């Protein structure tokens, strides 16, 4: 758990230092079982989980020329992941597949992504550009981004481990909130309302000493502090339930949390199935 907290602290620190980039909207064509495409780490909004990534956050900010003779028709013409805007012979904007070789060179390992066919791509830009060239094919239809980071061996999730996953997830979300609270001195990592809720969690963090406790004691503690236990889950749910806000989480909405967790927690894929 200490390693996870250290990892989260590093991500939160990097989120504060990173320049804000423009986010891309979700890809329009998504198979129900596929995961939404995920990318480079953008600046984390106030009150957001630093491990949760934004869909399309790998997009490079479009450069603008200092001297613009006429408005570029492509300026406000959106293209989905893997495509770029070009003008046809009538000066009409159109979306075409991006050449993978035109993608920016990766800075480090953290930019690499793994596809569901276990192939590592240098960045999400390279992945989406490659997927675009396969549009209309069976392979392209099935291909999607699986998780962030280079492909690695992920051991199978045992039934006993899967049954414990919700508790690990709840505790992990709680630890994320507590870590953000402890580092929130003027950094605006949490909203004022969130700070008040997490303050209670922080103050009660050590009400039970580590060790084995009777089930009855743990049950009473859970009932007494129910709101404290469920707030981290509600906090994360509220961040993900956005498109649309309907009280349900689709595979697309879960993707920003799922993709960065898979390399760290091998039961993630099975839990979110």
UniProtKB/Swiss-Prot annotation:
GO CC aspect terms: basement membrane; extracellular space
UniProt KW keywords: Basement membrane, Calcium, Copper, Disulfide bond, Extracellular matrix, Glycoprotein, Secreted, Signal
Signal peptide segment: 1-17
Segments forming domain Follistatin-like: 73-95
An MF annotation (GO) of this entry: extracellular matrix binding
Domain annotation EF-hand: ranges: 263-273
Keyword Transmembrane helix assigned: no
Disulfide bond entries: 74-85, 79-95, 97-132, 103-125, 114-151, 157-267
Compartment annotation: Secreted, Extracellular space, Extracellular matrix, Basement membrane
Domain Kazal-like: 91-153
Expressing tissues: Detected in chondrocytes.
Family matches, as InterPro entries: EF-hand-dom_pair, Fol_N, Follistatin/Osteonectin_EGF, Kazal_dom, Kazal_dom_sf, Osteonectin_CS, SPARC/Testican_Ca-bd-dom, SPARC_FS
Biological function: Appears to regulate cell growth through interactions with the extracellular matrix and cytokines. Binds calcium and copper, several types of collagen, albumin, thrombospondin, PDGF and cell membranes. There are two calcium binding sites; an acidic domain that binds 5 to 8 Ca(2+) with a low affinity and an EF-hand loop that binds a Ca(2+) ion with a high affinity.
Family stated for the protein in its record: Belongs to the SPARC family.
Protein name (Swiss-Prot/TrEMBL): SPARC
Annotated gene: SPARC
